[in-house]
Structure formats: C-alpha cells, structure tokens
From Swiss-Prot:
This is Protein ERP4. One of its GO terms (biological process) is endoplasmic reticulum to Golgi vesicle-mediated transport. The chain crosses the membrane at residues 175-195. SMART domains: EMP24_GP25L (SM01190). One of its GO terms (cellular component) is endoplasmic reticulum. InterPro entries: Emp24-like, GOLD_dom, GOLD_dom_sf. Residues 22-174 are lumenal. It is a single-pass type I membrane protein. PROSITE patterns: GOLD (PS50866). It comes from Saccharomyces cerevisiae (strain ATCC 204508 / S288c). Residues 1-21 form the signal peptide.
Amino acid sequence: MRVFTLIAILFSSSLLTHAFSSNYAPVGISLPAFTKECLYYDLSSDKDVLVVSYQVLTGGNFEIDFDITAPDGSVIVTERQKKHSDFLLKSFGIGKYTFCLSNNYGTSPKKVEITLEKEKEIVSSHESKEDIIANNAIEEIDRNLNKITKTMDYLRAREWRNMYTVSSTESRLTWLSLLIMGVMVGISIVQALIIQFFFTSRQKNYV
C-alpha cells in the first residue's frame, strides 16, 4: 500500500510540475534600434503575484529600458540601461498590466527574452497528513525544477552574448584587415608614383 501511495505521489508530482512549468515560457522579442515593444498581462485578483524576468541575448551593448505600468496608468517600475532583471510583482489593482521594453542605446537591433510567470496560490491547510506530505514533495520538486530552468536560461543568455561578441569581433577584425590592406596598397601606389616622378624629372633635366 505504501509503495502504491509513493508511486501515485511521484506520478502526480511529475504531472503537476509539468503543468506548472508549462504555464509560462520565455517570450523572444526583437527590438530594432530606437523602438519600443510592450506585453500585457491581466491580473484577476488582488492576491495574484507575478514573477517577471528579462534578459538581453544579443545586440550592441546589451542595454535596454524597461517599464511596468499599472492598470490605472501609473508607472510602478522604471529601469534604464539594464541587461537583465527580476521582479516579484504584487497586485497594484485588478486589470491589465503593461510591460514595455525600449531599445534606446546604439544602432544595433537587440534580442530580448522575457518571462511572465504567475506565482502559485497557497494551498489550504485543511488537508490530511498524506496530502500535506505529497504537496510538500510536489512543491520541492517544483522549486528545484524552477531553479534548474532559471540557471539554464541564464547560461543560455550568457552563451548568446558570448557568441554575439565573438561574431561582432570577427566582423570588426575582417573590416580592419581589409582597411589595413587598402592603406598598404594606397601607400605602395603613392610610393611608386613618387619614384616615377623623380625619375621623369631627372630625365627632363638631362635633356
């Protein structure tokens, strides 16, 4: 009986953690230079709590502006020249919240990944002992899964940034090499013309 209960707990926990993890997913947004993009989220209860995080993956200096506006139009969060950030947003009233990202720095387009995750509601305490143990096990698995997911997202973002930096450096080195070659060719042509001018002027003097 205990084995069957344990199997049932593990099975239900795997289903619930999958459900919790599938409730949200990172949204990729492309921000051309000097543009602004906004996302919207409706909170239906004053007890709702929203976990908000974003990170810049590629583009220039990886810096953007970020604002959160409450349903009444008041700006509750303002960030400038940030590469990444995390918020725990408690309700400022029921209604539609606006999350805006602006690329106001540099002429490079930027790719941003943003996550809006509604925090789980606290389960009622009027439960049996077995249900409490099962819920604790589920919550522990869910917390560990969230930690792993956030760590993987962070590492992936760093990999994107490093790849973009390497690609940008390679492009700059290529153009710098072409510029140096052009300068060397130009100097060689000027030297040849100067030498030719000297020889031509000497021949005229002899004549």
